[in-house]
Amino acid sequence: MSKRYAVVLAAGQGTRMKSKLYKVLHPVCGKPMVEHVVDQISTLNVDKVVTIVGHGAEKVQEHLAGKSEFVKQEEQLGTAHAVLQAKAELAGKDGVTLVVCGDTPLIEASTMEALLKYHHEKRAKATILTTVIEDPTGYGRIIRDDLGIVEKIVEHKDATEKEQRISEINTGTYCFDNKALFEALENVSNDNVQGEYYLPDVIKILKDSDEVVAAYRMESFEESLGVNDRIALAEASRLMQRRINENHMRNGVTLVNPENTYIDIDVKIGQDTVIEPGVMLRGETVIGDDCVVTSGSEIVNSVIGERVHVKTSSIFESKVGDDVQIGPYAHLRPESDIHDHVKIGNYVETKKAVVGEGTKLPHFIYMGDAEIGKNVNVGCGSIAVNYDGKNKAKTIIGDNVFVGCNSNLIAPVKVGDRAFIAAGSTITKDVPDDALGIARAKQDNKLGYAKHLNHGK
C-alpha cells in the first residue's frame, strides 16, 4: 500500500460566524468540528496528518495535540495557497494525499476510504469527491464529457446557463497523487477577481497535462456540509445528533423522542436504558444497562452504573454506582462518588462527597466535602457546613449513623459508627461510636405568655 497523507484546511477566519471563538473550534455534539474531521482521518491508517492553521492557531493546536502536525498560513490567500504551506512536510514524497476542509464535521471515514480506493482503481492523479443536490446554487459544478470523464470544475459565478443546470457539485474534498499535487500547486495563478490561489485550479493544470482526473460521487450531501455561519452550525449539529441517536437505538437504547434528546458523540450508553425527551448527556459520560433518565436531566462527564434511575436531576463529573435512585431535582456536583443502593432524593446537593452503600439522603440536604459511610440515614434539612468564609473543611460520618432533621454538622467534624444525631442539633465536636449527639437549646414554655403577643383573636 502506498503512503497516505492528509491535509486539513483550518486556517479560515470564519467572519460569518460572528464569534470570538475560532470557526473550526465551534463544537458539534460535544467536539470541535475540526476534531471530528481529524478523528475520522485517524482511522484510515494515514502516515501523517498536517493541519493548516491561521487565526487562533494556538487554540487549534491545543485541541489537536498528538493527533496532527501543524503549519501556519500567515496570510489567507486561498485554498491552494493553504495546501502549499505543507510543502516542507510533504513535497517530494511518494503516496497519496487527502485534502479535507476542517469545517466539514459530518465527513465519515468510510467515505474517505472509498475515495482513496476509487482514486487507486482509476490510477488518477487527482480525484474529486462529488455529490448531487437539488439546489446547487453557489457550488462549483463538475463538468464531464460525453464519456463521463471529468473535464473541469466551474465555479457557480463563472458557469454558463447550461452548466448551472448541472446538479453534481464539488464538495471540497480531494485525493491527489502527492508529487503531482505539489508540482501543480507551483503553477496555480491568482489571476481572478479575489486575487487568491484556488485548489480547483490544480484540476485544470493536471487535465491540461493529460493526467487522469476522476470524480467519486457519494450518495449523501450532508457529509459535505460546510459550516460557515450559525445556521449551518445548527444544521450540522442536528444531522450529527440524528446520526448519534440512531446509532444508540441500533445498539439497544430506547430514546423516547430522539429529536429532543441531546447526546454528545463520546457518550456511551448500555442496553435497555431508557432516555426520555429533553435529556442532555455531555462529554465522556458513560451510562450502564437498564437505567432510566427522565426528562430535564443533564449528565456531564460522569459514570453511571446499572439500574440507576435519574429523575430530572443534574450530575456533573461524578460517579454513581448500581441500583441508585437520584432525584427529582437533585444536583451532584463534581467529585461526588455515590456507591451502590443509595437514595439521593429531591433537592439534595452533593459536592466532593463520598456516599456509602445503602445510605439514604432523602430530601433537602447539602453534603459538601463529606465522607458518609454505609447505611446512613440523613434527615431532611441537614447540612454538612464545610465553609467558614475562608477555608473548606471535611465532615466524616461513619456507618449505620442516623442524622435527625435540620442538623448542622460544622466541619471539621467526625461522627462515629452507629451514632445518633438528635434532630435540630448543631454539632461542633466529634461524636463517638454508639453515642447520641445532641446540641440544641433546652425548650422553655412560658405559660400564658402568648396572650400578650396579640398574634390572633
Swiss-Prot record:
InterPro entries, per the entry: Bifunctional_GlmU, GlmU-like, GlmU_C_LbH, Hexapep, Hexapep_transf_CS, NTP_transferase_dom, Nucleotide-diphossugar_trans, Trimer_LpxA-like_sf
Residues that hold acetyl-CoA according to the record: N386, Y387, A423, R440
Cofactor(s) this protein requires: Mg(2+)
GO molecular function: glucosamine-1-phosphate N-acetyltransferase activity; magnesium ion binding; UDP-N-acetylglucosamine diphosphorylase activity
SUPFAM superfamilies given in the database record: Nucleotide-diphospho-sugar transferases, Trimeric LpxA-like enzymes
UniProt keyword list: Acyltransferase, Cell shape, Cell wall biogenesis/degradation, Cytoplasm, Magnesium, Metal-binding, Multifunctional enzyme, Nucleotidyltransferase, Peptidoglycan synthesis, Repeat, Transferase
Biological pathway: Nucleotide-sugar biosynthesis; UDP-N-acetyl-alpha-D-glucosamine biosynthesis; N-acetyl-alpha-D-glucosamine 1-phosphate from alpha-D-glucosamine 6-phosphate (route II): step 2/2; Nucleotide-sugar biosynthesis; UDP-N-acetyl-alpha-D-glucosamine biosynthesis; UDP-N-acetyl-alpha-D-glucosamine from N-acetyl-alpha-D-glucosamine 1-phosphate: step 1/1; Bacterial outer membrane biogenesis; LPS lipid A biosynthesis
Binding sites annotated in the UniProt record for UDP-N-acetyl-alpha-D-glucosamine: 9-12, 23, 73, 78-79, 140, 155, 170, 228, 333, 351, 366, 377
Catalytic activity, EC: 2.7.7.23, 2.3.1.157
Ranges where the record places region Pyrophosphorylase: 1-230
One GO term describing the cellular component: membrane
Region (N-acetyltransferase): 252-457
GO biological process, one term: cell wall organization
Top-rank taxon, per record: Bacteria
Cystine residue pairs: none
Positions of Mg(2+) binding: D103, N228
Enzyme class: transferase
Keyword ATP-binding on entry: no
Protein's job: Catalyzes the last two sequential reactions in the de novo biosynthetic pathway for UDP-N-acetylglucosamine (UDP-GlcNAc). The C-terminal domain catalyzes the transfer of acetyl group from acetyl coenzyme A to glucosamine-1-phosphate (GlcN-1-P) to produce N-acetylglucosamine-1-phosphate (GlcNAc-1-P), which is converted into UDP-GlcNAc by the transfer of uridine 5-monophosphate (from uridine 5-triphosphate), a reaction catalyzed by the N-terminal domain.
Protein name: Bifunctional protein GlmU
Protein's organism: Listeria monocytogenes serotype 4b (strain CLIP80459)
Taxonomic lineage: Bacteria, Bacillati, Bacillota, Bacilli, Bacillales
